[in-house]
Regions:
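Acidic, low-complexity/disordered tracts enriched in E/D and polar residues
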Residues: 1-48, 88
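Long, charge-rich, low-complexity alpha-helical segments
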Residues: 30-94
Length: 94
């Protein structure tokens, strides 16, 4: 899976947001408000865009490596729910 458009994650006065950038900005108008974990997912998906995407399993592994104090099942559940929202908004491609 991969993002349908390139996105930039920014911290604006403590509020983490993501916006489409470059040529892709015409595909998505608006801004996503994110928590830290969702921002990490966007960043992972952005990095894997040029490689053709990343599998759900590898995305979750990457998150579990960063968030070692968190329950692996909760990480996977959060990732699944967030990716489902991205899919519903047309921001995720398989």
């Amino acid at each position: 899976m991969r993002l349908a458009c390139e996105m930039a994650v920014m911290d604006m006065d403590g509020e983490i947001t993501a916006v489409a950038v470059g040529e892709d900005s015409a595909k998505f108008h608006g801004m996503l408000r994110l928590n830290e974990e969702a921002a990490d997912i966007i960043n992972i998906l952005n990095m894997s865009r040029s490689d053709g995407g990343i599998s759900f399993k590898n995305l979750v592994k990457s998150l579990q490596t960063k968030y070692t104090d968190s329950d692996p099942e909760e990480i996977a559940k959060f990732a699944e729910e967030f990716l489902k929202k991205l899919w519903q908004e047309g921001l995720l491609i398989e």
